[in-house]
Curated annotation (Swiss-Prot):
It comes from Xanthomonas campestris pv. campestris (strain B100). This is 4-hydroxythreonine-4-phosphate dehydrogenase. The gene is pdxA. One of its GO terms (biological process) is pyridoxal phosphate biosynthetic process. Its EC number is 1.1.1.262. Catalyzes the NAD(P)-dependent oxidation of 4-(phosphooxy)-L-threonine (HTP) into 2-amino-3-oxo-4-(phosphooxy)butyric acid which spontaneously decarboxylates to form 3-amino-2-oxopropyl phosphate (AHAP). Gene3D superfamilies: Isopropylmalate Dehydrogenase. It is found in: Cytoplasm. Its main location: cytoplasm. Its cofactor is Zn(2+); Mg(2+); Co(2+). InterPro entries: PdxA, PdxA_fam. Binds 1 divalent metal cation per subunit. Can use ions such as Zn(2+), Mg(2+) or Co(2+). Signal peptide: none annotated.
Amino acid sequence: MVPSLALVPGEPAGIGPELCIRLAQQPRSDAHLIVYADPDTLHSAAKALCLSVRLLDPDQPARLPGDLPLHPIRQAAPTRFGTPDPANAAAVIAGLLGAAGDCLSGKLQGIVTGPVHKAVINAGGIAYTGTTELLAAQAGCPVVMMLANSIVRVALVTTHLPLRAVPEAITAEALARCLRITATAMQRDFGLEHPRIAVLGLNPHAGEDGLLGREELDVIIPVLDQLRSEGMQLIGPLPADTAFLPQKLTDFDAVVAMYHDQGLPVLKYSGFEQAVNITLGLPYPRVAVDHGTALELAGRGVADPSSLLAATALCARLAARS
C-alpha cells in the first residue's frame, strides 16, 4: 500500500500553488498526494499555467493528469500572485498544522511543504520563525534541519540565528542532541546501519589548537569523544573550508555544520535545483523545497518544479520505510 502524503503549497501568492499544479500533471505510483490548500487558489494557478486541474475528495485516487485530491483550507482573501496578503497568514498556518496533525494521528504518513513567507505570516499577527520550528513545537520533540541533494547531506546545529549569537548557542547539549538525532535518522530513514558523520569546527581551521577560538577544545571535541565512546562514527572537527572537497565527501554520509551559512552555500552551489530540506526527529517524514516563494515569478508559468519533485519523491521513500 502506497503512503498518503500531505502537500502544502505554502504562501498562496508565491510559486507554491503552481508547482502543485505541475506536480499533478504526472500521476504518481509511489504515493497518494493530498493538497492542503484553497481550491480557488489552485484553480487560479491552473488557469495561469493553461493547465487542467480536477480537484478530488481526499480519499479519491489521482488517475489522470491534473487530478489532485484536496483537503480544502479556505483563505480570508483572494490570491493575487506576486502580492502576498497578511490576511491569508492564518490559512497558511492552518494548512501546515492541519497536515502535520493528520500525520501525528496516523491518517497520513508524511508531509511535503512549499515555501512560506515569514514576514507576511508575522505581518498577519502570527509569531512565526519557520516551518521546522512550527512543526517541532506541535509535535513536542527536538528536531534537526538537514538539507540534501544527490551529492551531500548537511545537518545544522543552529539554524536561523544572527551570526553573533552562534558561538553562545553551540553548547555541548545542543551539539550532542543534533548528532544523536542525525545519526538516528541516517539509520532509520536512510538505511545506514553505521553512518559516518563529519563534524565541522566553528572557527577558521577548526580553531587551530585554540589559537583562533576555543569552542573546538572546550565544547566540540569533548562531545565528539563522548559520542565516539558510545559507538558513533564521527570525523572531526574538520576545517569547513576543505571539508567539502569532492575526494573527502566519499568518506562520510552526512556533514554537521555549526551554523546556517557555514554548511549550506556549498550544498546549494553543488545542486540547488534538486536540493531539499528534511526535518529530522519528527515522528513522521517532512520534506520541503529548498527555495523561497519567488513572488516575482508567481503566476508566470516559469517556476522550476525540480525541488518539489525531489522533495515529493524523497518523502514517499522515507514514508515507505517508516
